[in-house]
Amino acid sequence: MVFPQKSKEKLRYLKDRWDDQVAKSLDEAELLRYRSNLLGSDLRITNFGGGNTSSKIEEKDPLDGNKATVLWIKGSGGDIGSIQRKGFATLYLDKLHAAAKRYRGVEFEDEMVDMYPLCAFGNNTVAASIDTPLHGFLPFAHIDHLHPDWGIALAAAANGREKMEEFNRRFEHRLIWLPWQRPGFELAMMLRQAISASKGCDGIVLGGHGLFTWGETQRECYLNTLTIIDQLGQFVAQHVEEKGNVLFGGTVSAALENQRELAIDIFPFIRGRVSTGQRMIGSFSNSAEVLRFVNSAEAQRLAHLGTSCPDHFIRTKIRPLFVAWEPSSMLNGLREKIDEALKVYRDEYKQYYDSFAAPDSPKMRDMNPTVVLIPGIGMFSFGKNKTEARITGEFYTNAIHVMEGATALGTGKAHDVLPQAGPAAKTEAFAVHENYVALPPSEAFRIEYWQLEEAKIRRQPPEKELSRRVVVVVGGGNGVGEATARQAAERGAHVVVADRDAEAAKKTTAEAQKIAGKEAAMAVSIDIRDREAIREAFREVIATYGGMDILINTAAIFPSSPDGVIQDGQWGTTLDINVTANHRLADELAPILREQNLDGSIVLTSSANAVVPKRGSEAYDVSKAAVSHLVRELAISLAPKVRVNGISPATVVKGSTMFPRDRVIASLTKYEIKFDFKATDEQLRGLLAEFYAKRTLTHCPIDPEDCAAAILFLAGPESRCTTGHLIPVDGGLTEAFLR
């Protein structure tokens, strides 16, 4: 049925994005994909990766040619906002119902997952979601199970069932309530029984969990879902507005005016501390909703209670780290407060694991928090990559919305029996504060360390050698720097393309993003002659990723001197850019790496010219000789945490900005190499590169990609025992052999 309130005019917060022109050309499976993408495109409807959508579709059985009812359901670990047709699992509905006969009770819940592949329709190998029986056992053609903040606020309220009835009366709905139960076959049985006993109900609120809605057509299901969530929003928002400034006990800490600058100052320190188990990438939020929470009187207690929705604490862990710090314009004492709070957090996490782990539980994971809350500043979130770090922050923002809504729904009345309580957990197991109900730690553990969640982790592809690392490539807009940025992206790094040429940097960044993802690469403008410009570029990197791990500099100049005479200004500029700038870069990076207290790496670019003197290139040759020695000096001064190495390439012509057309033509003329004036720049560079190659033992032209491979070998973990070293990349120049 379609509710009478449903119309575009009746939606206050959400938007009906359904397009009949698009929908009419789609088959049922594509309509499911379309419906899912529309719902998942709005984080108010469900969080990233959260919830599930399904359809029961009549299809021709490939085995016997007869019609079969097939359950299409989002595959395990998928995101409905981006899912495509191939991301859905398909199961024979009758086989899924038959599997229910094998169910031996809640203690044997996990063994039922092995039944899902036996129910697969056709050759579909997509892992079915743990929610599969929940959708399969409900007698509706199309079902949405979502985690809207407004819905979870109701589900996590101590008076949630009472408020649900009030909502039903106001909006003429027939929602029903189920107590908390971990997803799986047991919950599916509870759903089936509840629907059977409540004819005409139009939705289900799962205590401490989420919302179920449905429809007999794809369109009807979408509208039913949209309407109920929007009306829940109206209901909860009214209570929030009525509470006003007294929400969360009111504000006790003022937001600092320089909060972003302070966040950048402290970010590397926090990143280093939460990376003691495994290196993390960071994200920062100082949104109004985050600041209202972290600056409130009840923030510390509510944060310690933990989150309520299973989807939340898979990423945020059972609780965030709240740092009880009195905000000031300086960071006085904050580092000490963070260290103290972290010790307590790790001890509590170990106690949590030891209290609930069974002999067959997965081993304890990283004890560090993934969310850090600091009054006056905001929220720092962490993950294995930028996207995960950002999403983790979004999930905790969802948790803040839930706590806001649940506390706003409160009337000040205590509840002897919680509506979330049921067979899985009694009232006394739940923690309650200001009407907000957090899941019992035992139930949180059963989700976080569920074998099915462990299986999701194991299905993820192995991480690459530069995963979780932030690599800054100075001079990344062209030539060797461009090749290095691309290869770093291929090896899993978060790549920062730093260049004076903003357009070139953007071009390389776009290439790196195609390889590693949009959030895994960024461009920054930098002038290595200016210490303040370097500092600002590095702070921009910290603001985005939380810190830095590897610095690579390929930027250099070769002074033009047609008459063979180097002017004083050229000499000074060459040494400033080719030598002193390397020292500036290292000098600005050093305090960042010290704050992180993680292993770091620097790779500089010297040249074969450092040991092979040539007429007319004195300034360049001397500068590169100095770079070679600077590598050794920095290796000593930055040890033991930071390794410093370099490469000594022979002439790299391909893609090099140091070889403009006029210089290439001059060199071709000098060496009496025939060429066509109509040839392109790269064709001319190719002729010169071939000439240089013939002077080496291998006769191989030195390409940017060759230099990049050597650079990244030195930068990465494969060379963890190498520092103060230079690798020749010269094809075999005998006069440049190391002696």
PLM feature spans:
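Glycine-rich flexible loops
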Residues: 1-471, 483
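Substrate-binding pocket helix/loop in short-chain dehydrogenase/reductase
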Residues: 562-575, 692
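Active-site loop immediately N-terminal to the catalytic Tyr-X3-Lys motif
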Residues: 564, 612-618, 699, 717
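Active-site helix of classical SDR
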Residues: 586, 623
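Residue(s) in the substrate-gating loop at a strand-loop-helix junction
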Residues: 607
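Short, small/polar-rich loop/turn modules that mediate ligand/substrate recognition or access, typified
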Residues: 639-643, 722-724
